């Protein structure tokens, strides 16, 4: 039992890592993950917000164009698809669903030639806060 407390040197031909080496590598990996994961999640959120802004712009433009062309506002987002102004109702990137869009209807006519009221704006159905502190459903 003379050599039990001593760390023995590696002999030629022995392979592997010591427990200390493995612990150091794991600590470095954990440190990198604590920095990388929040940055990744933030960039995913910003990307979803960019998609939301683009989808809202596209749908609002389609609503306006439909209103001018048909001389009446669409009664729902499905009208925009049926008339060919949108291929499909886009999926809300914040709710991951296409049926959560909130439309606002107006009895006020948007165009001088318009004969019937209908939807005049669309918003996300998400209740969460954006990176700028505003609620998605106010965009």
Residue ranges and their predicted role:
Residues 39-56:
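Aliphatic-rich helix starts adjacent to a transmembrane/signal segment
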Residues 8, 17, 51-52, 64-66:
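A generic structural signal for short
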Residues 13-40:
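N-terminal single-pass transmembrane signal-anchor helix
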Residues 57-139:
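Low-complexity, acidic interaction segments enriched in glycine
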Residues 34, 42, 49, 61, ...:
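Regular, well-ordered alpha-helical segments
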Residues 1-15:
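N-terminal leader/signal peptides at the extreme start of proteins
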């Amino acid at each position: 039992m003379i050599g039990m407390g001593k760390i023995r040197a590696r002999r030629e031909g022995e392979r592997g890592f010591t427990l200390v080496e493995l612990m150091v590598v794991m600590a470095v990996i954990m440190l990198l993950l604590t920095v990388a994961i929040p940055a990744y999640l933030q960039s995913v959120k910003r990307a979803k917000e960019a998609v939301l802004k683009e989808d809202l712009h596209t749908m609002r433009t389609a609503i306006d164009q439909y209103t001018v062309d048909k001389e009446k506002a669409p009664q729902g987002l499905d009208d925009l698809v049926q008339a060919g102004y949108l291929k499909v109702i886009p999926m809300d990137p914040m709710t991951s669903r296409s049926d959560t869009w909130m439309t606002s209807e107006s009895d006020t006519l948007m165009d001088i030639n318009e004969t019937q009221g209908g939807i005049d704006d669309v918003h996300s159905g998400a209740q969460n806060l954006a990176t700028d502190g505003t609620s998605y459903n106010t965009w």
